[in-house]
Every structure is written in C-alpha cells, then in structure tokens.
A protein has these predicted regions:
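Secondary-structure "cap/kink" motif recognition
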Residues: 1-329
Length: 329
C-alpha cells in the first residue's frame, strides 16, 4: 500500500511539473510571436532619429549626425554620447517579461494614459518604425510597464512588463526631456593622438603659466608663459598632464546662478584660461573663475565659461590637476 502511494505521489508531481513546463513554453511561444510585444530594434545602426515627449510638455529631439560621432539635440546642441548610446543599447536589449497581471491591467492602463513618456524611433522615414509608451516601474522595481505602437498594427491594447536582457531594474529614467541633462558637457575632446598643444594661463600669477606642445610622433616640449623653451625634468609627468586634456568634462549646465550672477561671471576676469589645439585645426578655450563662499574659494566647485559664453559648474577634483603650476614640472 505504501509503495502504491509513493508511485501515485510521484506520478502526480511529475504530471504537475510537466504541465507547468508545457504551459510556460507555450506562453513564451505565444509571446515571441505577438507583434504587440515586439519592442526591440534589431539593428540600431539604422536608427537616425529619436523623439521623446513627456506629459508636462517637455520634448527632446535627438538626430544622428553624419559628420560626427555625437548626436544633435533639438537641432541646436550636441547631445551626451553616453546617454544616446544608452538609448540604443536599450532599444536592442529590451525584452518582454510578460503581460500585465489581469488584476493590475486597468490600473496600469490608466496610469500609462496619464504619465507615460512617448518615445518615437525612426529609421530614415517620416514615420516612426516603433513608438514606445514608457510608464512607471513595477512594484518590485524589476520591470517597466510599456505599450507598443507600430504603423502596421497601430497602438497595442495590451500593456507589458519589460526589462533589459541580463539586468534587473526599470527603464523610465533613461527617457528624459530636460535639455540641460541631455546637453553634452565636454570641454575638450581630442581622441587618440589628435591633441597638438595645451596652454594654461594663470592670470593671477603669470609665472606659473605654461604651454605643452606635441608633434605627430608624440614628442613633447615645454614652454613657460613667455614662450621660452624649458628643459623637461620629468617627461612622464609632463606627458601625463598633456594627455589629461584629451577628454575633459564640466559638471553641469545648472550653475545655480541668477541671470545677473551669470552676467557678473562673464564680465569678470578669469583666474585661469585653458587653450587647447588639435592637429586637425580645431581649438577650444575654457575660462575658470573662483566660486566664492563666506570663507573663501569653494573647495569643491568653480565656475567655467565655455567658448560659446555659457557659465557652467565644474568640479575642482577634475580641474585642479589641469591647472598645476609650472614649477610642478
């Protein structure tokens, strides 16, 4: 009797497990063939335009440039490469975890209607190949509620829970419309061996100013502020300082200054000026100003003035090594 009970129990468990596996596989098969769940973009190299809109009226138009590795922002600015790369990565790695639970469906649809961000993805045509409606995260913060729209099928009536392959989290924060967050924060961008010359001017102590020059072979020379060539005591240190100028970013366009405060910076005399030139003829200038506090210069931040005349916030952690005095070499 006990033996028969064991056999019966094994058969029941086996049947249940087989049913679960069959049902799971069948559900996945149905989902993979469901055009309403086909969010992914197979070839992101064909994506040439992305339009993002939120429910507050904010928009961001990102367009691929044929002349640069950077995308343009609203036809006026340069977009952050890390942010556009993240979008393209999201487009290709997105996967559907499953449909929304029936009990949650109406609530999710209602929330999507009120808060979803619209993301249009273009591949050369006048109409988006796919439009995502990106909602909030799931209660567990391991997925995001989304709805798909395509020219062929229109807008899906079914919301899905999506995530990225190989990762856990939600996607909402990747799709933002704040222009200051989208704008490229690069001060200098001279990749590889394209950097030819760096000049750092210490306006308050001119004798600390210097220029480092390089030829296409990578040989460097050092000059003081008057243009006199100096002997290099530590070649590795000078080369290291020179190479630090290849890629430099400021902290933020949000400088926390009023318009009057910004104008005051523009009219002030800078503490430092950095001039950088490349072998391709490009050049860039960046001025630095002390950020004054009640106890003296701020220990963490300074103000910067871009070539285009915009006042930005910079981290001293990044820029202090770039304004070392000549005697340090």
């Amino acid at each position: 009797m006990k033996s028969n009970l064991r056999i019966l129990l094994v058969l029941v468990i086996t049947t249940i497990i087989t049913g679960i596996i069959w049902k799971t596989q069948d559900a996945k098969g149905d989902l993979s063939s469901n055009v309403q769940a086909d969010f992914a973009i197979a070839d992101t190299s064909l994506v040439n335009k992305i339009f993002i809109a939120d429910n507050q009226g904010g928009t961001a138009l990102l367009e691929r440039s044929e002349e640069s590795r950077f995308w343009t922002l609203n036809g006026e600015f340069i977009a952050r490469k890390d942010a556009t790369d993240l979008l393209l990565k999201t487009f290709t790695r997105i996967e559907v975890k499953g449909p929304v639970n029936e009990k949650m469906r109406e609530t999710v649809i209602r929330n999507l209607a009120g808060t979803a961000k619209k993301v249009e993805i273009y591949q050369g045509g006048d109409r988006p190949v796919k439009t995502w409606y990106v909602g909030t995260s799931t209660p567990s913060h391991t997925g995001t509620y989304m709805v798909l729209e395509t020219p062929e099928q229109g807008m899906s009536s079914e919301p899905f829970v999506v995530s990225l392959k190989g990762s856990i989290g939600f996607l909402t924060t990747r799709f933002f419309t704040d222009i200051t967050e989208w704008r490229y924060t690069g001060v200098f961008d001279f990749p590889g061996r394209s950097l030819a010359e760096v000049t750092v001017i210490h306006h308050e102590t001119p004798y600390h100013s210097y220029t480092i020059k390089s030829n296409p072979k990578g040989d460097i020379s050092l000059e003081n502020g008057a243009g006199a060539i100096l002997a290099i005591r530590d070649t590795i240190k000078v080369q290291d300082r020179f190479l630090h100028f290849r890629k430099v970013h400021f902290e933020s366009f949000n400088n926390h200054l009023t318009k009057a405060g910004q104008e005051s910076i523009r009219n002030a005399f800078p503490a430092f000026t950095m001039l950088v030139k490349g072998f391709d003829g490009r050049s860039a200038k960046f001025d630095l100003f002390w950020k004054q506090t009640d106890s003296g210069p701020d220990e963490e931040y300074m103000y910067g003035l871009t070539t285009g005349g915009e006042v930005v916030l910079v981290q001293r952690y990044v820029f202090d090594p770039l304004i070392e005095v000549l005697s340090d070499f």
